[in-house]
From Swiss-Prot:
It is an enzyme of class 3 (hydrolase). This is Cytidine deaminase. Belongs to the cytidine and deoxycytidylate deaminase family. Substrate binds at residues 88-90. The active site is at residue 103. It comes from the Bacteria. This enzyme scavenges exogenous and endogenous cytidine and 2'-deoxycytidine for UMP synthesis. Zn(2+) binds at residues 101, 128, 131. InterPro entries: APOBEC/CMP_deaminase_Zn-bd, CMP_dCMP_dom, Cyd/dCyd_deaminase_Zn-bd, Cyt/Deoxycyt_deaminase, Cytidine_deaminase-like, Cytidine_deaminase_bacteria. Its cofactor is Zn(2+).
Length: 296
């Protein structure tokens, strides 16, 4: 079991903890498939809802909040039945807008894993307005059921009445609907190709600034992040922040980053290079490789 879960595992009921420990191996980064979730429910003699709420301390253990020191964990349950953990991330010494909220982390985890719809969000603190707006960008976002400890469950539409969302800006394919933009680039660099692929899968209906970041650690492992825009603009999730969140979920340290690549469209209304460099340089003293590509 990873050291970061030692304290949180003690907060779980013993039968659930005993069933969960084998899953918390070195490669665990917060994903539990539907079959393993069903086994946890059976072994713990708890309901699924009770298990998901009980797992929140495990999700919160993924957090990296050097500024607030407030650990927030979130669990997104997909239509597939799989669950995806996420946690808040803050960049030391940097402006607060660089922060990743736990719900954003969990949703990006699900998106990068190929999930097509979120049906439940379990979180250990009431979602802030920023996160409510971010969730509203998703497929049937208003119908996502929000679960909080010691509170009744409600749909997102309860927490965000009279919502402004993608349809108000004539966007008919919201976040998590698979969309692919093709770009022209001649490269044999595997890391650049990976970034290009993820840029094509990014979500930028308001600026067409399709973009992705890939980070590489010294052992050759790579961690990606895609741009995810929001109808309200400010809650958009930047690709560097998503990549850094992905890296920390996998229990990797910022000091291990050896290479960083940003690929973005030449036809976008904005560029993400400045924001990406600021975030990267807050945690790693390496240069950002910036590649601009033309859509086909």
């Amino acid at each position: 079991m990873q050291d970061r879960f030692i304290r949180s595992i003690t907060q779980l009921p013993t039968p659930l903890a005993d069933a969960l420990i084998p899953l918390l191996h070195q490669g665990f980064a917060g994903h539990i498939d539907a079959q393993h979730l069903a086994e946890l429910v059976k072994s713990s003699n708890m309901t699924e809802s009770e298990v998901l709420l009980a797992l929140l301390p495990i999700a919160a253990a993924l957090a990296k909040p050097p500024i607030s020191e407030f650990y927030v964990g979130a669990i997104a349950k997909g239509k597939s039945g799989d669950i995806y953990m996420g946690a808040n991330l803050e960049l030391p010494g940097e402006a607060l807008f660089h922060s990743v909220h736990a719900e954003q982390s969990a949703i990006s985890h699900a998106w990068l894993s190929g999930e097509s719809q979120i049906v439940d969000m379990i979180v250990n603190a009431s979602p802030c307005g920023h996160c409510r707006q971010f969730m509203n960008e998703l497929v049937d976002g208003g119908q996502i059921k929000i679960h909080l400890p010691s509170q009744d469950s409600h749909l997102l539409s309860y927490y965000l009445p009279y919502a402004f969302g993608p349809k108000d800006l004539n966007v008919q394919s919201p976040l998590l609907v698979k969309q692919e933009t093709e770009f022209a680039l001649d490269s044999s660099d595997p890391m650049v190709i990976e970034a290009l692929d993820h840029a094509g899968l990014s979500y930028a209906p308001y600026t067409q600034s399709y973009a992705a970041v890939v980070l590489e650690t010294a052992d050759g492992a790579t961690y990606c992040g895609r741009y995810a825009e929001n109808a309200a603009f400010n809650p958009s999730m930047l690709p560097m922040q998503m990549a850094l969140s992905n890296l920390t979920r996998h229990n990797r340290d910022f000091a291990e980053i050896r290479r960083a690549v940003l690929v973005e469209s030449s036809q976008g209304k904005i560029s993400l290079v400045g924001a990406a460099m600021d975030a990267l340089h807050a945690v790693a003293a390496i240069e950002l490789e910036h590649i601009v590509v033309d859509p086909i």
